[in-house]
Amino acid sequence: MAWLAADADFNPDQLGLNVIGIASEIARHDSGEHAHKMGQLLFTNSGSIRITLSGQLCILPPAHIAWIPPDTTHRAEMSQVTGYRSVYINTVQYPILPKEVKVLQVSSLLKEILERIAFADFDTDWSKRPFLDLLNVGLNEIETASSVSVILQFPTDRRLRKFLGTELLPHLNVFADLVGLSEKTIGRIFLRETGLNYQQWRQQWRFLKAIELLSKNEKISVISHHLGFSCESAFIAFFKRMSGKSPRMLIKKDQS
């Protein structure tokens, strides 16, 4: 295990191990764009992690795990994060892990296993019992865990990309005037390149931004105004519809 400072550089590929765990209490950190030969599981007890991938945005909520396959270029930005843990795994040795980026719900059992791996010594022999048993249970838990829709695909059309950033896009008719394309053309581009129509994409962006702001302990009144809702109750209803949970449940989970 390596207990890392927020500004520390760490390259798991240099160690030549099959399983590596690290832990940190990171308040704020930006990994920069990078990739590694090992797959990576990352999670946090509180706060969210913004993960930027090639053409995709992922917001990792607290008490969830993100799986990033080997050789996947990504950038992880953390704000107000505590209890950061990362587990690197050689997928040649353990091919059961997913081939694509996933965000998964974490059972109490899986969380405890990942915690133990994150704090294990680097020289732990994961090919021998009892460590092998622990690792196998963890891998089985990952295989059966439910995935969460917190990854947003961005359109690649250059006419649209320059308008897609950190702020909520306007309604379709306003955006069409801004871009200089018809509403139908924009709708076709979004559906073809993201799998979502414009309104669905806009709502998913809102949802991810809401998770990020909730994880920073922003007030619901502030979030609902920032995301263009008419009132708090409208935002709460939206969040429940998107996640099946109320915003306060996420906050409670974050602080537990």
PLM features per residue range, with description:
Residues 55-70:
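Short acidic-glycine-tyrosine-enriched beta hairpin
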Residues 1-48:
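Generic protein-terminus/edge-of-domain signal
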Residues 63, 186, 190, 234-235, ...:
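Short hydrophobic/aromatic patch on the recognition helix
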Residues 31, 46-52, 65-66, 74:
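Short beta-strand segments in beta-sandwich/barrel cores
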Residues 99-111, 115-116:
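Aromatic/histidine-rich interaction motifs
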Residues 72-101:
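Ligand-binding loop in jelly-roll beta-barrel domains
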Residues 117-124, 140-150, 160-174, 190, ...:
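Basic, amphipathic alpha-helical hairpins
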